[in-house]
Amino acid sequence: MPRSLRRARNDEGWGAGMSVPPRILAIAGSDSSGGAGIQADIKTITVLGGYAMTAITAITAQNTLGVSAVDALSPEMVAAQIDACVSDIGVDAIKIGMLGSPAIAA
């Protein structure tokens, strides 16, 4: 569990008056321009008061004019990222965006 979330926890659970943000896992592609994908998900989750975690499915080369390249990660790498978050931090909600390939969706 990240230090920011660990700090609020005591032996009986969450400390009196401590508000733990919802833990949101965003599964999506990475947009190099920051206008969409994981980058936009992190911004939105943070503004809404959540704790953002990510599993990157693909890396894109894009800007305001369009997408020029996409490179999907392996399903094993995506699964490893998801497991790393779920097994340690826990997840309250999942947001799914671009999966990158049919193999990742399977």
Question: What is the predicted role of each segment?
Answer:
Residues A8-G13:
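A cross-taxon signal for low-complexity, glycine/charged-rich
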